[in-house]
Amino acid sequence: MLLVLSQRQADKETVNFLQSRMKTVWVKLESAEEFDVKAGIASGAFGLVTDGDPKNIAQAYAELDGLKGGTLSRSPLNVAHRGDPFKYNENSMEGFRAACEAGATHLEVDAHLTKDDQIVIMHDADLSRTTNGRGNIRSMTLEEIRQYKIIRNLGNMTTGSESDIPTIDELFSYCRDKEILIFFEIKSSASDFVSVFKRKIEEYGMEDNIVVISFDRTQLSAVREHIPYLWALDLNYTKENIGKTITDLCTRGVGIDMSYGNVLPQLTRSMLDRGFPPAYWTYSTKTDVETAIRDGVYGITNNDAVAAGALPEKLTFGELAPVKKSEFLSEEFTLPVFVESYDGTRTETRGALYAYRDAGEYAEVILRAETGKWSLLSDVVRVEYASEENSASSSEDGGCGSFVGLPFACAAAAGLVLVLKRRRG
């Protein structure tokens, strides 16, 4: 699903809200002037649309190529595959809580339907692999299923603890008041699954918090028909002609989430150019997650979301003191900024100017800050001007630190942004 926002609509928070639900955002720039172009890039949107000279956008990206280490314009998704699936029992509430508390942006869960039409969270159709019981979920009532406990992790090793088999009610009760989204995989082929699922979504007010994923194309079609406000991703992908794949996805009105074995720069770019954000599964470790980020992957389903929670996610600000207008002209100008990790840890540092615009009584700025992994870009920030006659304000108040030009690097990791030149008339 592709959404085109005006530049006034496209602040970082709005773009992230939409794209974290796997909806691709492009921004219609107000102009092709330098600040508007860089603000469009910093919004994190996957595409820029201009009526102006596209060479200005190309020039902005040319500046990125030489930047050491790369810079992210958007925060990739830290999707916790079956919770924290090696430390805790697989698909258990304990694992879900641990992942959320450690910085997962999404939970990836699996669901089946019981004999009495209750949705339970479990990967396999049978209880035997992960629990201390046996039996096919579809042929058992919820009461029968709840006699048993989850005792194994994703590696099929006993954890030494027992966990209740979660229901959709328990999952939704936990998630609905938190800033956590769900990649909800439909494992069941039951024809009434989607109707039960819809009732639960609306009962718990989860309409904005779910992306459906499935290998079952019949269920994906049912979701798009009966729960049209949910976006759905097909987990199937074959290395057929890319044009046929895109045509099929568009015909069925779904997106795609592919096995990470298919990660190729050309494929990622081809999908992104056609409005499909790059999402892949399932990465094993934090190191793999870092590699995925540098490879340009946005939706990163992984088994190590707790450790990945320590990775730098975004820049945030405290209260910024007024700054003399003349100080913005210094190549060594910086402002205080916090690097915030997925787990909420904040580290204070200095951000250099990526872009500056004089708005009369105040300045609009975009900052870039190093994190030790990659650099991050801020949203557009308003900074009040201080009086030029006020000697108490010095360059040190504005900050001093290393600054190299007005750089931005999306690298392969940050985003493959499409620039369109619209024809008039």
Which stretches of residues belong to each language-model region?
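Short, ordered coil/turn segments that flank beta-strands lining enzyme active or ligand-binding pockets
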Residues: K115, Y342, E370
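C-terminal low-complexity, Ser/Thr- and acidic/Pro-rich disordered "stalk" regions positioned immediately N-terminal
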Residues: V380-G398
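Phosphate-group recognition and catalysis centered on beta-loop-alpha active-site segments
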Residues: M1-S330, P336, E364
